[in-house]
Amino acid sequence: MAEAQQARVQNAVEEMVQNLEKEHIRKMQGRMFRCSAECCEHPGNSMNQVHQCIERCHTPLAKAQGLVTSELEQFQDRLSRCTMHCSDKAKDLFDSGAKEPAVRALMDGCVGSCVDEHLNLLPSMTRRLKDSLNSIPQ
């Protein structure tokens, strides 16, 4: 993928992830740490009980991180498939005897379309992630 197109995707995804982190993940981290500290405040509990308590505190955050990771992987996979399709089209054009400038123009245009298409998916992906994060029991 052309560097400028790759930077567009990377910047947009980073901005989305940073917003999710500030609005959702960070709050969940705070709850997890407070909950974990509370687990340690009971001197009568065994080491195993404290460990299980801390694990329960960590579960919502782990689930949230898994959701975000899974969604980002799916996004990356879709974008990769789109750009691979562009590469196949460019190879076919080159194999049919087209000159390099024509092949490059096709590739640049196709990859640009992939990037535009996938950047347009980010708002719905963000809404879906926010809804999923909000539905995780705390």
UniProtKB/Swiss-Prot annotation:
Domain of life: Eukaryota
GO CC term, one of those recorded: cytoplasm
InterPro entries: DUF842_euk
Record Pfam families: DUF842
Homology family: Belongs to the FAM136 family.
PANTHER family, per database record: PROTEIN FAM136A
Name used for this protein in its record: Protein FAM136A
